[in-house]
Regions:
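Conserved alpha/beta core of the MobA/IspD/sugar-nucleotide pyrophosphorylase nucleotidyltransferase superfamily
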Residues: 1-64
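N-terminal Rossmann NAD(P)H-binding glycine-rich loop of SDR-like oxidoreductase domains
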Residues: 78, 86
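Conserved NAD(P)H cofactor-binding loop of Rossmann-fold oxidoreductase domains
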Residues: 134-140
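Substrate-binding pocket helix/loop in short-chain dehydrogenase/reductase
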Residues: 142-143, 150-152
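A short, exposed helix-loop element centered on a Lys and neighboring polar residues
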Residues: 166-167, 210
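Catalytic loop of short-chain dehydrogenase/reductase
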Residues: 179-204, 209-218, 230
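C-terminal helical subdomain
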Residues: 218, 225, 241-280
Length: 280
């Protein structure tokens, strides 16, 4: 029909199949119509750049119901976000075990240390329900001037450590139907000068989270990743010095929202945590 033009499927149906009923359903602003191969490519790029919605904040009663009697393991739990997550979980009745270099002499980048922690916690509590890894190091400097030792030490902590944690704790999380939480940085979307090691490792963590969510789906183990905006932690202060408090998230706020993610039914999601208002 060379004289017929239409910009949508409904017009075609009305013209050639007038006896067929057409229903109208409510859509969503995030719906995307895929009709051409390029649409699939665009959709994939949007998925890569779009953070998932944060889960609904839990009430005190819900925190207690989901944490009381459960075992939570936190790597990097001596201070900062990890320390605050541990404190919150403990307040709601969880059996919390924290591990770090400074408090327990645990090197999360060493598989033997991670395996030892898993067995120790299992012996002490009989189960492992939640695992959080907040351990990380922030190395600054031009890559061309970075020593091989620094490259290995940074990559070991920021990337290999989460892999070892995932491998060693997966069997225990599969038994409990548990959840693992990792952390990335806003630099994962685009590498930054002077942060090549850090930002590339954080991009890898995002990919690792998504891959593990697929691999673990049939085992009932969830894994998500939190991407907090600039947060007031000892690691950041050491790297950048004192900054105006109003420009940073508090580690307590990040910890509570991270706990919501850890306890949610989500898996494979990258959750942005941002300040609601305040100076840029």
């Amino acid at each position: 029909d060379p004289n017929f033009t239409a910009t949508d499927d409904c017009t075609v149906v009305l013209r050639y199949l007038p006896e067929v009923s057409i229903a109208v359903v409510s859509g969503h602003e995030r719906n995307m119509k895929v009709t051409e191969p390029i649409d699939v490519y665009i959709a994939d790029k949007l998925f890569q750049l779009t953070s998932a919605d944060r889960p609904t904040p839990l009430t005190n009663e819900q925190y207690s119901a989901r944490l009381d009697g459960r075992t939570v393991v936190v790597f990097g739990g001596s201070y900062g976000i990890g320390g605050d997550i541990a404190e919150l979980a403990r307040a709601y009745g969880a059996n919390v075990r924290t591990f770090s270099r400074s408090t327990t002499g645990t090197y999360v980048e060493k598989r033997a240390d991670v395996a030892k922690v898993a067995q120790q916690v299992l012996d002490e509590t009989g189960r492992i329900d939640f695992v959080v890894n907040t351990a990380g190091v922030l190395v600054r400097g031009e890559l061309a001037e970075t020593s091989e030792e620094t490259i290995y030490s940074s990559t070991d902590v920021n990337y290999l450590a989460p892999i070892f944690v995932a491998q060693e704790f997966f069997p225990h999380l599969a038994k409990s139907g548990g959840s693992m939480l990792l952390f990335t940085s806003s630099s994962y979307t685009r590498g930054r000068s002077g942060y090549s090691l850090y930002s590339s490792a954080k991009a890898a963590i995002v990919n690792l989270t998504q891959a593990l969510a697929d691999e673990w789906a049939t085992s009932g183990v969830r894994v998500n990743c939190v991407n907090p905006e600039r947060t007031g932690t000892p690691m950041r202060t050491k790297a950048f010095g004192e900054e105006p408090p109003g420009t940073l998230l508090s580690s307590e706020d990040v910890a509570r929202q991270s706990l919501d993610v850890l306890l949610s039914h989500l898996t494979g999601h990258i959750i942005d945590i941002r300040r609601e208002e305040g100076p840029a």
